[in-house]
Amino acid sequence: MTFIHPTAIVDPAAKLADDVKVGPWTYIGEGVEIGAGSVIESHVVLKGPTQIGCNNHIYQFSSVGEATPDLKYKGEPTKLIIGDNNIIREGVTLHRGTVQDRGETRIGNNNLLMAYVHVGHDSVVGNHCILVNNAALAGHVIVDDYAILGGFTLVHQFSRIGAYSFTGMGSAVGKDIPAFMMVAGAPAAARSINMEGLKRRGFSKDDIAKLNKSFKLIYRRGLTLEAAIEELTPLAQDCAAIVTLIASLRASKRGIVR
C-alpha cells in the first residue's frame, strides 16, 4: 500500500499508485501522477502537470515539474513526462515545457541524473543516459540514448547530444555532438570516438574500427560536413553504427562540434 509520511503534503488531485512511498516534508501538487514502485524521498517538490512512470527514485531537495523561467512563459498548461526506472539524485531541477516549442519536457527510461543536474524546458533526454553532477541542459536540448555528460557540462539551447557520446568534465557544448563522439573543453571540441564506452556497450571490434575511421574522415581531412557524409555512405552498407552516425550528422541544425 501507499506510504505517505505524516509531514508530507499531497494534493487530493494528485494520483499515486498503490505502492508509492513518500518521505517527510515532501510536497506533491495537483496534476502529478506517480507510477508503481516509485520512491519519493524527503524534501522533494513535485508540481504538475507531471507524469512520472514506474520504479523511479527521486532523492531529497529535487524540484520536479516546476514552471520554466523562460520569460515568454505566461502560465500556459505544459508538461513534464518521466518514464520508468530513473534515478534522480539530490537537488536535481526538471522544468516543464513551453507552448513555443513542444509543450513538454521529457525524460525517458533507465537514466541516472546525479546531484544538481538541471534539465531545462522542452528538453528531451532519451534512455540509458547518465548526467553527472551539475551537468546543465538549457532549453530545447536533445540528449540521445546512452549518452554520458561529464560533471559540470553546460549545453547551449537547441543543441543535440548524439547517442553513445561522451563529454569531458566542464565541457561547454555550443553545437551538436555527433553520435559516438567524445568531446571536451570550453568550447567543446571533438577528441576521438567514445572508445571505452563503445567497448562497454558491446560494440564489435569491426564497428569500432569503422567508427574510428569515420572520426578521422570527419575531423582530420578538412572536409565539409556534406562531403564527409558522402564519403561515409559506402561504409554504412554493412554497419548499423555508421547508419546511426550519418543520421546524427544529417540531423544537425546548429552544426557539429569541431
Swiss-Prot record:
Location in or out of the cell: Cytoplasm
Keywords for the protein's UniProt record, in alphabetical order: Acyltransferase, Cytoplasm, Lipid A biosynthesis, Lipid biosynthesis, Lipid metabolism, Repeat, Transferase
Catalytic activity: a (3R)-hydroxyacyl-[ACP] + UDP-N-acetyl-alpha-D-glucosamine = a UDP-3-O-[(3R)-3-hydroxyacyl]-N-acetyl-alpha-D-glucosamine + holo-[ACP]
Listed transmembrane segments: none
Keyword Lipid biosynthesis: yes
Family: Belongs to the transferase hexapeptide repeat family. LpxA subfamily.
Subunit: Homotrimer.
Protein task: Involved in the biosynthesis of lipid A, a phosphorylated glycolipid that anchors the lipopolysaccharide to the outer membrane of the cell.
Protein name: Acyl-[acyl-carrier-protein]--UDP-N-acetylglucosamine O-acyltransferase
Organism the protein comes from: Saccharophagus degradans (strain 2-40 / ATCC 43961 / DSM 17024)
